C-alpha cells in the first residue's frame, strides 16, 4: 500500500525553466517501469508536437524550446500503451518569461475564477474585479491546449460559454 502511495505522489510531470534561457526542462517520472516514452506538448493552443525520449537515470528529461510569448503549455506522455494525461486533465502550466514564472494550472482553477466572477456580478459588487476575472479566464480559455474530441474540449467550451454569458449580464 505504501509503495502505491509513493508512486502516486512522485510519478508525473515536472517543468522547470533552464537557467538563463526561456526554454523548459520537462522531467517525467512514469507510473510504470519503461525505457522510452513519447512526450506530447502544445504551447498556447498551437498544434501538438512530440518528441521521443529515453530514460536517463530515474527520469525522462526533455528540453522544449519555448516560443516568444507563451502563455501556457500542455503536456502528456505515452509509454507502453499507457497515456499519462493527468487523469484526463493534461499537465498544464502557465508561463511568463519576464519575470520568469511557471505555475501549475487547470481548468478547475478557471472554473473557480468564473464562479467568483459570477458571485460578484450577481451581488452587483466589485464589477470591475469580475470584469478582470472574466478577461483572464477568456484569455486562458483561448490559448489552453486540449486534445480534440476529449472531455477537456467539452469542458473548455462549456466554460467559454459561461464567460460569454456572464459578460452579457454585466451592466456598465
Task: For each feature predicted by the language model, list its residue ranges.
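Positively charged n-region of N-terminal signal peptides that target proteins for export
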Residues: 1-3
Amino acid at each position: 500500500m505504501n509503495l502505491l502511495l509513493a508512486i502516486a505522489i512522485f510519478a508525473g510531470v515536472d517543468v522547470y525553466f533552464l537557467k538563463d534561457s526561456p526554454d523548459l526542462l520537462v522531467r517525467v517520472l512514469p507510473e510504470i517501469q519503461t525505457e522510452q516514452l513519447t512526450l506530447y506538448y502544445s504551447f498556447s493552443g498551437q498544434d501538438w508536437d512530440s518528441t521521443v525520449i529515453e530514460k536517463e537515470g530515474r527520469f525522462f528529461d526533455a528540453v522544449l524550446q519555448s516560443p516568444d510569448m507563451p502563455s501556457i503549455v500542455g503536456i502528456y506522455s505515452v509509454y507502453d500503451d499507457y497515456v499519462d494525461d493527468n487523469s484526463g486533465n493534461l499537465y498544464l502550466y502557465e508561463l511568463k518569461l519576464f519575470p520568469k514564472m511557471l505555475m501549475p494550472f487547470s481548468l478547475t482553477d478557471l472554473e473557480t475564477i468564473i464562479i467568483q466572477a459570477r458571485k460578484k456580478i450577481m451581488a452587483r459588487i466589485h464589477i470591475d474585479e469580475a470584469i478582470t476575472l472574466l478577461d483572464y479566464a477568456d484569455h486562458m480559455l483561448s490559448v489552453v491546449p486540449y486534445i480534440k474530441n476529449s472531455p477537456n474540449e467539452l469542458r473548455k467550451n462549456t466554460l467559454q460559454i459561461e464567460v460569454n454569458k456572464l459578460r452579457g449580464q454585466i451592466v456598465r
